[in-house]
C-alpha cells in the first residue's frame, strides 16, 4: 500500500531489465509458436535444454537459451512466467539495480538448468528418464526471483484477483 493510503495494483511500470527479458521471451515464443504451427520444432530442439544433447553433443549454450524458449503449443506457460517476472522482478531490480538483478536472474536460471541436467545423470529410474526430455522456460529463474523477493520483502500481502 502506498504512503498515501491508496491501493496498488501490480508492481508498477516495468524496469529496463524486466522489460527486456519480457520482450525477448515473448518474441522467442511467437517465433517458435509460428514455426511449430508450420511443423518446425527446430527452435525448441536447438535452444531447449536436453541433457542428452548437452552431454553427448556438447550443446553448451542450452543451459542459457532454454530460459527464453517456452512451450509453443500454448500461451499459459509463457504468460504466467512473464506475469511472475513482472510482479517480482520489478521490485528486485529497483532494490538491486539492473546489473545485479540480471546477474541474479541468470545465475538462478542457468543454475536450475545445470541442476536439472545433472539430476538426469542419477541412476534412479525417474531421474534417468529426464536425460532425453527437453526442458524449456524461465521457471527456474522465476523461482529464484520468488526466493529473492520473499527474503527481501517478507511481509507484503499478495492478492490475486483475476475477475
Tell where the protein language model's regions lie, with residue ranges.
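A detector for small-residue-rich transmembrane helices and their helix-helix packing motifs
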Residues: 1-163
Amino acid at each position: 500500500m502506498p504512503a498515501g493510503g491508496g491501493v496498488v495494483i501490480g508492481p508498477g511500470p516495468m524496469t529496463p531489465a524486466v522489460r527486456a527479458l519480457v520482450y525477448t521471451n515473448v518474441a522467442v515464443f511467437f517465433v517458435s509458436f509460428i514455426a511449430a504451427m508450420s511443423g518446425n520444432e527446430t527452435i525448441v530442439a536447438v535452444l531447449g535444454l536436453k541433457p542428452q544433447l548437452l552431454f553427448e553433443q556438447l550443446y553448451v549454450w542450452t543451459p542459457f537459451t532454454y530460459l527464453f524458449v517456452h512451450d509453443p503449443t500454448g500461451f499459459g506457460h509463457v504468460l504466467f512466467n512473464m506475469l511472475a517476472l513482472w510482479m517480482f522482478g520489478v521490485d528486485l531490480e529497483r532494490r538491486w539495480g539492473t546489473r545485479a538483478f540480471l546477474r541474479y536472474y541468470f545465475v538462478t536460471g542457468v543454475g536450475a538448468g545445470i541442476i536439472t541436467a545433472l539430476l538426469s545423470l542419477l541412476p534412479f529410474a525417474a531421474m534417468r528418464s529426464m536425460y532425453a526430455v527437453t526442458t524449456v522456460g524461465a521457471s527456474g529463474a522465476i523461482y529464484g526471483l520468488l526466493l529473492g523477493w520473499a527474503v527481501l520483502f517478507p511481509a507484503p500481502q499478495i492478492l490475486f484477483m483475476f475477475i
